[in-house]
Amino acid sequence: MPVGTCESLCKDNIVISPEYYGTTQHSLESPNFVVLGGNENYCCKVTQLYSRVKNGAFSYIYVDWKTAELAKYMENCWIATKVTFCNEFADIAKAFGIQYERLRQCFVADERVNPSHTYVYPEQPYYDSHCLNKDIPALLVSCKSNKIKPPLTDKVHMINLERKSK
């Protein structure tokens, strides 16, 4: 969903909650947080619905529409960047005769580095998931139509396309 979609609908009673379906860490089956964008009164009503369906045993983050629309794009761009970064370091390690898994263990030992998405697969040295494949290009299109240039995200996307084509 392009950033600004809810605002363009001009309906105060719209609440957006970015989806995290499928096999992601933040699946709807066991979420640890829910982002709700919109009027706070309506967000509270949605929170009440969640508490009835899923016992509400997770945190709620209330934000405006645009922030909610951009939040999932930001998360998926970070994951795409991390996958691309780790695959690049796997290539560098291989060139130096170093086992990537040993290098990765050193990297994730630092508490500031989350180990998710740091594994690499030689037969697939790129990201290829439904969400990343749709969200990264969608964000780039949305940015372009708003005259925004995100050079890092654009480069990550281009590197991924190059790796897929090999």
Say what each PLM segment does.
Residues 1-166:
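Structural/interface elements that position substrates and couple domains in central-metabolism enzymes
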